[in-house]
Amino acid sequence: DRKFNAADFADKVNGLLADQESLVIILNTPAHNPTGYSLTLEDWDRVVSILTDAAGCGKAIALVVDAAYIDFAGDEEEYRRFLPKLDELPENVISIMAYSLSKTYTLYGTRCGAMICIARTKDIADEFKRVCEYSSRGSWSNSAKVAQVILSRIYGDPELLADVDAERAHYRDMLAARGKAFTEAAGEAGLDIVPFDAGFFVSIPCDDPDAVSAELEKEGVFIVPLAKGLRVSVASISEEKCRRLPAIIKAAMEKPGM
């Protein structure tokens, strides 16, 4: 049905917990890379229900929500509506938000982000903080200072913050228009794509991605071959090209030998 496969998710969760003492789950949503899929509120209800049932075994479960692209997915409040649902999870399921400050504030090269713990008790939150302090120091020492200085200055200046928010909204709207153009054109061309909601990339199922990618290169079209498909970056091409590209890809996939 081209929606989140809750049944398979439940099977994987329960199967892994049967074989091991703890489980870490990473969900990249909204605006998943490389498909552009976003879990709906109904999807989140299923995730919470599955994890609540699975937690009955008493083992530790960590749900990591990789929300790096959340502020480029669409309306910022709308795409955060799933957050209260994480409060419904039982005590032995810890939720962690992986948030990218460098992406949200268009500072990609500075590589700055945050892990935000959503715990049911203060003891769990304190333990999470202690573990992160030690593991972070041992892995990369301190976070990028330049990014921290820039962000502190942005939040210390309301006018600058408003400018940054406006700039991000401009690029978010541009990205949404490109994604809409590509998906509409894909439908018109009969090009099958993985369900797309928002984001920087669109994925196309393909039996021989390397061959199709090589064929497209002959026409000056460069896309990334994946294990089972092709990845198109709608973030890197114009809206006009997003409308033209699906038909070109479809034609390449239908050539003899592909």
Please name every model-derived segment.
Residues 1-258:
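PLP-dependent class I/II
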